[in-house]
Amino acid sequence: MSESPYTSGTTHFGFRDVAAKDKQKLVGEVFTSVARNYDLMNDLMSLGVHRAWKRYFVTTAQVKPGDRVLDLAGGTGDIAVLLKERVGNEGAVVLGDINAGMLSVGRDRLTNRGLVSGFDYVQCNAEALPFPDQSFDLVTISFGLRNVTDKDAALREMYRVLKVGGQARVLEFSEVTAEWFKPIYDFHSFKILPKLGKLFARDADSYQYLAESIRKHPPQESLKGMMGEAGFARCHFKNLTGGIVAIHSGYKI
């Protein structure tokens, strides 16, 4: 049996080629660095629009009161809070993240807001989830898939833990569709964003990586195809704000 390209060889870390086995550690260092300023990072990367994107992502999800939901790369918990509003008191949200620092920030933030009941926190790798088959009615990942080394494995795991009839949703920075806007977006990403990261978070390198990681992420049609290969049916995507981000959806049938 041939060895997986993600257990040997190289992969990308931003625009750099690195040993595949090292990417998880390098990404972990980035998010440990930005954990306390994560919402600021998203504000800088999206000019504040990420809050509207996230709310739309959750309000259009297939979820109902009483459902059990998994939010991967759950970060500081903003998606988890919105999901909990949808599933209500009888439902549950599991916030999963591979990075202990991000998970700690999310737990502290929700606890400080008095949001305790119905939330669970699990440090986990999206490529090998510690949950039984068919555990969740909805699985989401927001602004996290591009940082995963083996995206195909993560999509297969999302499919595995999803109940039959359930939906998986991916919210991610994607490929801008308007040609006239691409140079403006590139200028903001590569010239402005690292400077803002240095100014506000004292960390230009992490913000440079985050901008580069967007350009290395599969474009919309490619990711749709990857979801189909992972087993999902009725896969589709919707561009938001001219393709700066896209929402991908698929179902387990």
UniProtKB/Swiss-Prot annotation:
EC nos: 2.1.1.163, 2.1.1.201
Known catalytic reactions: a 2-demethylmenaquinol + S-adenosyl-L-methionine = a menaquinol + S-adenosyl-L-homocysteine + H(+); a 2-methoxy-6-(all-trans-polyprenyl)benzene-1,4-diol + S-adenosyl-L-methionine = a 5-methoxy-2-methyl-3-(all-trans-polyprenyl)benzene-1,4-diol + S-adenosyl-L-homocysteine + H(+)
Disulfide bonding pattern of the chain: none
Gene Ontology MF term list: 2-methoxy-6-polyprenyl-1,4-benzoquinol methyltransferase activity; demethylmenaquinone methyltransferase activity
Enzyme class: transferase
Matches recorded under SUPFAM superfamilies: S-adenosyl-L-methionine-dependent methyltransferases
Binding site for S-adenosyl-L-methionine: T76, D97, N125, A126, S142
Pfam families found in the cross-reference section: Ubie_methyltran
Domain of life: Bacteria
Chain segments annotated as coiled-coil in the UniProt record: none
Keywords: Menaquinone biosynthesis, Methyltransferase, S-adenosyl-L-methionine, Transferase, Ubiquinone biosynthesis
GO biological process, one term: aerobic respiration
Pathway assigned in UniProt: Quinol/quinone metabolism; menaquinone biosynthesis; menaquinol from 1,4-dihydroxy-2-naphthoate: step 2/2; Cofactor biosynthesis; ubiquinone biosynthesis
Similarity field: Belongs to the class I-like SAM-binding methyltransferase superfamily. MenG/UbiE family.
PANTHER family per UniProt: 2-METHOXY-6-POLYPRENYL-1,4-BENZOQUINOL METHYLASE, MITOCHONDRIAL, METHYLTRANSFERASE
Chain's role: Methyltransferase required for the conversion of demethylmenaquinol (DMKH2) to menaquinol (MKH2) and the conversion of 2-polyprenyl-6-methoxy-1,4-benzoquinol (DDMQH2) to 2-polyprenyl-3-methyl-6-methoxy-1,4-benzoquinol (DMQH2).
Protein name: Ubiquinone/menaquinone biosynthesis C-methyltransferase UbiE
